[in-house]
Amino acid sequence: VKEQSVRRGNFLMFFSNGYRFRKYMKAILIGLPTWFVIGILINQSDRFAKVMYGSTTLDSGRSIMFAYVAISIGDILVGFVCQWLKSRKKGLLIFYILCVVSAFLFFSPLNSNDSVMYAICALLGFSTGFWAIFVTMGAEQFGTNLRATAATTIPNMVRGSLPLMNLLFLTLFQKSWGWPLIKSGILTGIIVMLISSVAYYYTEETYHKDLNYTE
């Protein structure tokens, strides 16, 4: 790359070409469920617990702790899963399914006390352990001269999407439309998963991709 007359690490290159921009957006959108789970379900688990089963003792800080311990385990395991399946997309799909199942349990009648809530938050955390693979997939969408820039900016774009999710969850659904907490959480989750699933479908498989090229 140093010997070639190509621009290196230029963030604006993601927006100067339609095909490259679409790849960049898809790489961001496949990671949205992570921050819906962490930023809304787990971070506000004390609010959900109070509405769902009347708890005033649940500590959202403990929910976050259990979730991040499980995320660490998921981050390690997803790499082995993708290696075994010889596919990044199949590994990501498995964790997407786990995420949907965990969210279903979160909103189900089974979530009826603090101990169960903590366990479900841990399961939600584990299911979002695809963070490592989603970042890897995003970086591998691009040539050598943009790969590091993609790997560092894509996760930050996903983190930055949380205020947009809160615009739906809190500002629009609850404050403007007067929806209850549970209904707002479920519909926000459905919208996020639908967007990510469409992006996933159109995202290129990178497991066997030759990465020796530049943009």
Please provide the spans of the model-predicted regions:
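Cytoplasmic membrane-interface "Motif A"-like loop-to-helix N-cap segments
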Residues: 84-96
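Hydrophobic core of transmembrane alpha-helices in multi-pass small-molecule transporters
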Residues: 115-129
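Intracellular juxtamembrane helix-capping segments at the cytosolic ends
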Residues: 129-142
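A membrane-interface helix-boundary motif in multi-pass transporters
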Residues: 88, 174-191
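Helix-to-loop junctions at the C-terminal end of transmembrane segments
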Residues: 74-87
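Extracytoplasmic gate region of multi-pass secondary transporters
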Residues: 20-72, 162-166
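C-terminal ends and interior cores of transmembrane alpha-helices
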Residues: 97-111
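A late C-terminal transmembrane helix in Major Facilitator Superfamily
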Residues: 139-175
